[in-house]
Amino acid sequence: ELVTADGEVVRTSEQEHPDLFWALHGGGGNFGVVTSFTFRLHELPQVTVALLLSPPEAGPEVTRAFRDVVESGPDELSGGVLYLTAPEEEFVPEHLVGKLACLTVVTYAGPEAAAREAMRPLLELGFEGEMVMEMPYAELQCALDDPPGYRVYWSAENLSSLPDEAVDRFTDRAADLLAPSPSQHVLFAQGGAMARGNPDFPVPWRTAPWVVHPFGLWEDPADDDRVRQWVRDVCADVRPWSMDAVYLNFLTDPDPDRMVAALGEANYGRLTEVKRRYDPDNVFHLNHNIAPR
């Protein structure tokens, strides 16, 4: 259910306003204000999470090992590699606190014993900091929420493959991350069930097996240019493997060409037609905008 630009309350489904229902599955906030929705959930009360910390120089080896484990593992296995400022946590060695480090976060939709077996080749590398635990899925979901009060700039590239050269491009650029800061330089796995959803919806990015997602969080305006350029450089480095399509929420300031690439040219054409039908005056424009034709 949503309120359209002319104040009408509209219910959408595959049978009611199916064009609008389609557009709302990936087209962002361009078509109205959603007031309620119904969706299907899968019960997953507990997950297993491994936090594996390394010095930054170990990043290339760790990233390759993580890639190999995920690509050969079951759908239940996922996660990412993050370069970040190491926090003061129980599993973090004192000599790494406050310094740039490489954190591998492995997630498993199942019990710890099965998780350890699935990621065994990765664990055999040995890490300076290690913690494996079961936790509620909801707790994992909010574990990497951004802290409030910071300046923010981020982007992403969805990769169709992750060869060794792409790993090197990703890990090399970590040296330019602003540290100490809450900024993070992230590579995470997709695929699995998400890649097998309805292919008709305008979310072509979800078939990508890998995502590179640099995001800057900083306080001093004097660092604005440095952080923004770092984000752009990261994306440029891995663009040879990019499929162009990308999750809109990962784009800070997309230009029109990037919007078309993010959604796919055919999808973008359909979305502009829906926009013209429900918001011809572009009332909803303070967003990742799709202009009406």
Where are these regions (language model features)?
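Soluble FAD-dependent oxygen oxidases
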Residues: 1-293
